[in-house]
């Protein structure tokens, strides 16, 4: 079934990402859950979002934050039950919100029934659901490394074979070359679609067509074939939003994956802009200042290359990234102004914007003692770098800037104990600034960051130029300003953002003369000669 523009509801949509563990606890155990999300649907409807992307809630031993799924048709008891999930899907619909699930199709948990069967014998019908190679103990089939370190091969002495895993040993890779695996996956997706799920985010989806013997782990030769079959057998049977996480995608691949003919996915997540503030050739912990002109160039490249032949996802934050207002804004003196500027800058672009929980409040990074962090990546890095001779101060500076727990502190609902997240002891400490930064203080304040996001969500629905306007980068070489225009047959929009904390002359005064200000982050926009610190203006005519 081809999907015409009317059916592509996600082009006008804004998606809200929820990290369930940290969103809202309903039973006092300190962990967020599905009933907690149901309790907060009114808040999300007020914001105006159209879909919720739920980070993994499937049954899982939680070796990798739920990205190790042991049962694709059940919910992890931490978050509730299958009944709770069905209730969330149905209640969200009443608020005009669809639910997107976070689906891992590259690998399962080693606790999954398929894998438990697969390792019993080479003749087991599930054996070929995974990738096995013969070998002697201690002599793996190759020296390939897993993404999280160590060998990509794990020995099972009972059958004298190694299985392949690109991530943890607890995450054996599924064998997509086996048509039975693909059929089982499609049946599972259709089962969720029957329950009313409105879309899927597909984790590391560009790694499913791996060929370990040839050392191919990403963008394998059969990738397009698998994508098209997956879409044909499942997604095209419903009007779904689908986003493929593709760390290895350039714009050419992204055009294939998000082809307007609807044969693969609605859009992709690409991360080219996300690694800019780290040293060349280093890890994310090796901090560097943001090369501002390069950021502009990369974002413009994705806007222009995918115009009319693909679709962008627009995001600053997710559950793995630091808070954008602390990262590229100013979370002290200009927190409100810089948070709004970053929102206006991103939401004026073409694509589907993603708001990560708390981003709409300007939630900030945290600075904890090492004992208070929960993320295994942070803890492992801390010990590794101490051994390598880094100073504790250096290491903590990197953790404060880039640690994943920055995104995972509990949602700040109000100024009561634990920010209204739980009546118990939260699984991770609440940010100390919850008494000043919280939803309760912002929802009814017309000048709040929340109200800025709410207005941006509505503007995308009201003005077609947000969806179909052609993007042109302006002032490409300007060291302080990120400006661009969007133009369709009816309207021209100009977005001008001062990215830094100094007042500067407004270089586009003539171009913007006589245009209406759609949204800005300062009340008075009558002075066309200067831009104040972090000032953002969106003009239209």
Predicted regions and their residues:
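Active-site and adjacent substrate-binding regions of carbohydrate-active enzymes
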Residues: 2-541
């Amino acid at each position: 079934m081809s999907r015409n523009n009317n059916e592509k509801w996600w082009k006008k949509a804004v998606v809200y990402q929820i990290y369930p563990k940290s969103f809202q606890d309903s039973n006092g155990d300190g962990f967020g859950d599905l009933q907690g999300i149901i309790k907060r649907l009114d808040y999300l409807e007020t914001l105006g979002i159209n879909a919720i992307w739920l980070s993994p809630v499937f049954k899982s031993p939680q070796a990798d934050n739920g990205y190790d799924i042991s049962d694709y048709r059940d919910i992890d008891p931490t978050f509730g039950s299958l009944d709770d999930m069905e209730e969330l899907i149905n209640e969200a619909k009443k608020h005009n919100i669809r639910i997107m699930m976070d689906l891992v199709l590259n690998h399962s948990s080693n606790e999954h029934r398929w894998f438990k069967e697969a390792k019993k014998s080479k003749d087991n019908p599930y054996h070929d659901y995974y990738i096995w190679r013969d070998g002697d103990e201690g002599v793996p089939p190759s020296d390939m490394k897993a993404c999280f370190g160590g060998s990509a091969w794990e020995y099972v002495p009972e059958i004298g074979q190694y299985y392949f895993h690109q991530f943890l040993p607890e995450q054996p890779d599924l064998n997509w070359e086996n048509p039975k695996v693909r059929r089982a996956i499609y049946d599972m997706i259709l089962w969720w679609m029957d329950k009313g799920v409105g879309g899927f985010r597909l984790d590391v989806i560009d790694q499913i067509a791996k060929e370990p013997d040839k050392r191919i782990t990403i963008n394998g030769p059969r990738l397009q074939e698998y994508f098209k079959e997956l879409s044909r057998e499942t997604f095209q049977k419903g009007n779904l939003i689908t986003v493929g996480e593709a760390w290895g995608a350039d714009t050419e691949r992204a055009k294939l994956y998000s082809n307007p003919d609807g044969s693969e996915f609605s859009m992709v997540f690409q991360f080219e802009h996300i690694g800019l503030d780290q040293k060349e050739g280093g890890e994310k912990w090796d901090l560097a200042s943001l090369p501002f002109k390069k950021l502009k160039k990369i974002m413009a490249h994705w806007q222009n290359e995918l115009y009319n032949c693909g679709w962008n996802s627009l995001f600053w934050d997710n559950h793995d990234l630091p808070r954008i207002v602390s990262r590229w804004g100013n979370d002290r003196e200009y927190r409100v102004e810089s948070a709004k500027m970053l929102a206006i800058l991103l939401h004026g672009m073409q694509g589907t914007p993603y708001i990560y929980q708390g981003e709409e409040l300007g939630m900030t990074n945290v600075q904890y003692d090492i004992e208070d962090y929960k993320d295994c990546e942070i803890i492992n890095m801390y010990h590794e770098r101490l051994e390598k001779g880094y100073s504790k101060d250096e290491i903590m500076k990197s953790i404060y800037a880039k640690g994943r727990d920055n995104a995972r502190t509990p949602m700040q609902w109000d100024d009561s104990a634990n920010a209204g997240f739980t009546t118990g002891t939260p699984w991770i400490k609440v940010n100390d600034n919850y008494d000043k930064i919280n939803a309760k203080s912002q929802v009814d304040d017309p000048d709040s960051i929340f109200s800025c996001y709410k207005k941006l969500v509505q503007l995308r629905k009201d003005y077609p130029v947000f969806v179909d306007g052609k993007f042109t980068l302006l002032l490409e070489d300007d060291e302080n300003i990120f400006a661009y225009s969007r133009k369709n047959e009816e309207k021209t929009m100009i977005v001008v953002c001062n990215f830094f904390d100094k007042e500067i002359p407004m270089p586009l005064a003539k171009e913007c003369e006589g245009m209406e200000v759609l949204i800005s982050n300062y009340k008075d926009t009558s002075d066309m000669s200067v831009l104040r610190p972090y000032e953002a203006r969106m003009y239209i005519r």
